Curated annotation (Swiss-Prot):
Protein name in UniProt: Protein GrpE
PANTHER family assigned to the protein according to its UniProt record, in alphabetical order: GRPE PROTEIN, GRPE PROTEIN HOMOLOG, MITOCHONDRIAL
Composition bias, Low complexity: 173-197
UniProt subcellular location: Cytoplasm
HAMAP family in alphabetical order: GrpE (MF_01151)
NCBIfam families: PRK14140.1, PRK14150.1, PRK14155.1
Subunit and interaction comment: Homodimer.
Cited function: Participates actively in the response to hyperosmotic and heat shock by preventing the aggregation of stress-denatured proteins, in association with DnaK and GrpE. It is the nucleotide exchange factor for DnaK and may function as a thermosensor. Unfolded proteins bind initially to DnaJ; upon interaction with the DnaJ-bound protein, DnaK hydrolyzes its bound ATP, resulting in the formation of a stable complex. GrpE releases ADP from DnaK; ATP binding to DnaK triggers the release of the substrate protein, thus completing the reaction cycle.
Main location: cytoplasm
Keywords: Chaperone, Cytoplasm, Stress response
Length: 208
């Protein structure tokens, strides 16, 4: 500082330097905030991804185990359906009760672990995502595209299909009443007049 310069004359330069430093610090703070938010988002995404992978691994393990048990569930269901319920033999009656209780307990265990049975009722709309049509037959009781009978129940685990329900479907030209949620004729692959030679029905494979 020369003799002619005074402290008051230097103050504008010092104020400018301070203002620039403040702006630089503000910019650095903003960058750090943005970086912190980005790291937090990445951490949350990593957490969600880990949880999803863990749930998928758990669901896969249960699905594989459940698939191994479906055969036993099918056999118990068939045994219950074809058991002589009008039998007067106490031993037979007790055996039937035991089979029914075993099937009920197995289905309860399935439900507790997220395994849901797919067992459409007669007349329900065919759903290609949940059902597999193994045959189609003309019907006067069910409208075209409706389920006539379930040949084998299906199962889904936490929204993921384990096995589609094997069903017989009412063929084109069937005259039964339509279910309330039946698709429009233009969207129903079974609707409309039966084609010549289709009266006996044919195999239809619609794997989910």
């Amino acid at each position: 500082m020369t003799d002619e310069q005074t402290p008051a004359e230097e103050m504008p330069f010092e104020a400018d330097d301070a203002a620039q430093e403040i702006e630089a610090l503000k910019l650095e703070v903003a960058q750090l905030k943005e970086q912190a938010l980005r790291y937090a988002a990445e951490a949350e995404n990593t957490k969600r991804r880990a949880e999803r992978e863990m749930n998928d691994a758990r669901a896969y393990a249960i699905q594989k185990f459940a698939r191994d048990l479906l055969g036993a569930a099918d056999n118990l269901g068939r045994a219950t359906a074809h058991s002589p319920k009008d039998s007067t033999d106490p031993a037979v009656k007790n055996f039937i009760i035991g089979v029914e209780m075993t099937e009920k307990e197995l289905q309860s265990a399935f439900e507790r672990n997220g395994l849901k049975k797919i067992d459409p009722a007669k007349g329900d709309k065919f759903d290609p995502h949940l059902h597999q049509a193994v045959t189609e037959q003309p019907s006067t009781e069910v409208a075209a595209g409706g389920v006539l009978m379930v040949m084998q129940a299906g199962y889904e685990l936490m929204g993921r299909l384990v096995r589609p329900a094997m069903v017989a479907v009412a063929a084109k030209g069937s005259t039964g009443p339509a279910s309330p949620d039946a698709p429009a004729a233009s969207a129903n692959p079974y609707a409309g007049a039966a084609a010549e030679g289709d009266s006996t029905g044919g195999a239809f494979d619609a794997k989910a």
